[in-house]
Regions:
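Surface-exposed extracytoplasmic segments
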Residues: 407-649
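C-terminal subdomain of the subtilisin-like protease fold in secreted/lumenal serine endopeptidases
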Residues: 107-125, 164, 204-282, 293, ...
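Short acidic, flexible loop segments centered on an aromatic residue
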Residues: 293-314, 388-390, 488-493
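Intrinsically disordered, low-complexity Pro/Gly/Ser/Thr-rich segments with frequent PxxP/GP/PP motifs
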Residues: 315-359
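Hydrolase catalytic cores
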Residues: 68-101, 165-232
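Beta-sheet-dominated interaction scaffolds and their linkers
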Residues: 144-150, 250-294, 321-325, 352-365, ...
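Terminal connector regions
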Residues: 343-394
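Structured lumen-facing ectodomains of secretory-pathway proteins
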Residues: 1-162, 166, 174-176, 240
């Protein structure tokens, strides 16, 4: 899309729309209403635009509410000569605009999609200008990642996913029940059958081989030359957590006489070093198995590589293996792959599950990946490897109990790591023991158990307004705060035994909409529940902080209130899996307070003194507080909090 003011914007033609042609006309974005911005029909099926409202014009439309194909159809019916649909969620700087399946509507004009960022640029600087779309300037997208494709690492185990890829856009699929009908189709639901078909071909060619062997053949021979965006980021390869072993190549797979895999996980194939929170440098070792299906002894060269040269140059991660491995006919040999992490060279972690929870591309700045190439004169196979290291702190306390003398006492906090250990202090108001293993789900169980560990609360000020923060810690971590855990804080403002307000976390916009976790707060039973804050939660963490304005939950700083915290399985069952109930607290009169920890945290390779004081009237105002909860950022998964039980005063 070319305009006089804005640099050319890359747009992806949607193959179910009319064929692209050279068009030029005023760029229009109808802001009359939400309906005209989105281009969706109303409940009665009425086009949001009247008659031929946009003759000779190129119409810019927002994604959302209805199928993109319906937006393009409505634009064509309104006289537009082309439709451009801007995405409504952020994407990575190298991501292509999304591709969509056909969702109905009569297609009379070409439809295109652009990114949210490019849409914002056009809206700000190019409306009313003459825009030109010229197919002669088109760039082939073959061999590049579709923006909609899911990315890894896997949700539960932080292992490499996807395993492999296949074509998934611009598919013309047979339409069931029509005999001759065809329907444009796109998505992972289109690419998965392609991989299934290639596996079936291999099973037909090698009926005696196991599922693991078939998978190894496919993954070892996939094409790794997959990019992201030939226009914006030419030559930049897609990360392992988007392509896995690469794009399937059945001809290579059927002809290979060599396979390789993670010896500890033959069905996984790839070398997944996973998420690693590290307070010091570390080394990880995996064993690779290589099988020779040939009839002669073969000596293979082994070459570990990085996907990105900048990762290798950083020195944060190094990977090594023997130069060669010899394998006799029909046999399997092994070798070690050693991956070392220099924690002092790792980037400072700034990911989260709140405001950045949907920004998968940000993982690129922290994960390290590449391939182990194994080759001889006959075969060249590869294994993907990946690690997601998190430079962590290691704050510990000198005591978990403290008896105050004269209303005061101290606890020493130490941090032997190379990173400042940030500490959030809360009034400890509730704790719960760890559930027995027998109560936890096993592989294949369709339920989750969120096991509460401790609850804390504190008064804060946000933009000059009083607010409350509840800190919750759990046994076990979650890859992302969206699922499978919801935390419900029920507040009884007047001690009548009936909960009056609720605070809870949820995904912004609904299931799988944005990836961002937010906090809702409002009156029971029906709200309205206002969303004002992102959830303060990291990835691969059992910690969460929920924030709410006091005005949204019927409190003042001096209100003594009762509250309970419920843990809910919000993915499988919707059931409450744990609860800490009946806590009483007054925000401006805690029983104990702590001070002395720098805002930057406990210094790296240093210590800080936490001073704890009793508060006059706190025992009556906040009787449930029995100490302080120390909530740690950038912590090891098994040590994200400490509780200090306090007595005396």
């Amino acid at each position: 899309v070319q305009t006089p003011t804005v640099a050319p914007v890359g747009a992806v033609w949607q193959s179910w729309s009319a064929a692209p042609s050279l068009v030029s006309g005023p760029l229009v974005y109808d802001t009359t209403s939400a309906s005209t911005r989105r281009g969706c029909v109303d409940a009665a099926g009425t086009n949001p635009w009247t008659g031929t409202q946009f003759p000779g014009k190129i119409l810019l439309i927002d994604r959302g509410i209805c199928a993109v194909s319906m937006k393009v159809a409505n634009a064509g019916a309104a006289g537009a000569i082309a439709a451009i649909v801007a995405n409504n969620v952020a994407q990575g700087p190298c991501d292509l605009p999304p591709t969509f399946s056909f969702g109905g509507g009569t297609q009379t004009i070409a439809g295109y999609t652009i990114t949210l960022a490019d849409g914002s640029t056009l809206k700000a600087s190019a409306l009313g200008e003459t825009a030109t779309i010229n197919p002669a300037n088109a760039i082939s997208l073959v061999g590049n990642m579709a923006a909609f494709s899911s990315r890894g690492p896997s949700y539960s185990y932080n292992s490499i996913k996807p395993d492999i890829g296949a074509v998934g856009t611009d598919i013309i699929s047979a339409e069931a029940g029509t005999a001759t009908g065809r329907t444009p189709f796109a998505g992972t639901s289109a690419s998965a059958p392609v991989v299934t078909g290639t596996a079936a071909l291999l099973v037909d060619a090698f009926p005696a081989r196991t599922p693991s062997e078939i998978k190894q053949m496919l993954m070892n021979t996939a094409d790794t030359n997959i990019g992201l965006n030939p226009a914006k980021c030419p030559g930049v390869g897609a990360p392992i957590s988007r392509i896995g072993s690469g794009e399937v190549r059945v001809d290579r797979a059927v002809n290979t006489k060599t396979t390789a895999w993670d010896n500890a996980a033959p069905i996984a194939v790839s070398l997944s070093f996973g998420y690693q929170a590290l307070t010091s440098s570390a080394q990880f070792v995996k064993t690779v198995a290589v099988h020779n299906y040939g009839t002669t002894t073969r000596t293979y060269s082994i070459t570990p590589t990085f996907r990105y040269q900048a990762d290798a140059a950083s020195g944060a991660v190094t990977i090594s293996a023997p130069l060669t491995v010899k394998v006799t006919p029909g046999a399997t040999a092994t070798f070690k792959v050693k991956l070392a992490v220099d924690v002092t060279k790792l980037p400072i972690w700034d990911l989260n599950g709140g405001s950045r929870g949907g920004d998968g591309f940000r993982l690129d700045g922290f994960e390290f990946d590449g391939y182990i190439n194994i080759s001889d004169n006959t075969d060249n196979v590869h294994l993907a490897w990946q690690i997601l290291p998190h430079r962590a702190a290691a704050v510990t306390t000198s005591a978990d109990t403290l008896t105050l003398m004269g209303g005061t006492g101290t606890v020493q906090l130490t941090n032997p790591s190379s990173l400042n250990g940030r500490v959030e202090l809360f009034s400890l108001t509730g704790s719960s023991g760890k559930m027995p293993q027998s109560m936890l789900p096993q592989p294949g169980d369709n339920f989750a158990v969120i096991d509460l560990r401790s609850v804390g609360v504190r008064l804060v000020t946000v933009s000059g307004l009083p607010a409350v923060q509840f800190a919750i810690t759990t046994f076990g971590i979650r890859s992302h705060p969206n699922y499978p855990a919801e935390f419900d804080i029920l507040i009884d403002t007047n001690h009548d035994g009936t909960d009056d307000f609720a605070i809870f976390n949820l995904e912004n916009g609904g299931f799988a909409a944005t990836g961002q976790n937010v906090v809702a707060a409002g009156p029971l039973p029906n709200g309205p529940f206002k969303v004002r804050f992102f959830t303060d939660a990291d990835l691969d963490s059992g910690n969460v902080i929920l924030t709410a304005l006091l005005s949204d939950i019927g409190l003042t700083p001096s209100t003594q209130f009762r509250f309970s915290v419920l843990a809910v399985d919000n993915y499988f069952t919707g059931a409450v899996t744990d609860a800490i109930v009946g806590m009483t607290y007054t925000l401006n009169t805690p029983r104990y307070v702590g001070s002395g920890i720098p805002t930057t945290g406990v210094p790296a390779s240093g210590s800080s003194t936490l001073t704890i004081n009793s508060v006059a009237g706190g025992a009556a105002a906040s009787p449930s507080q029995n100490g302080l909860l120390l909530w740690y950022r950038d912590a090891l998964p098994d040590h994200e909090k400490d509780s200090i039980l306090v007595t005396g005063g």
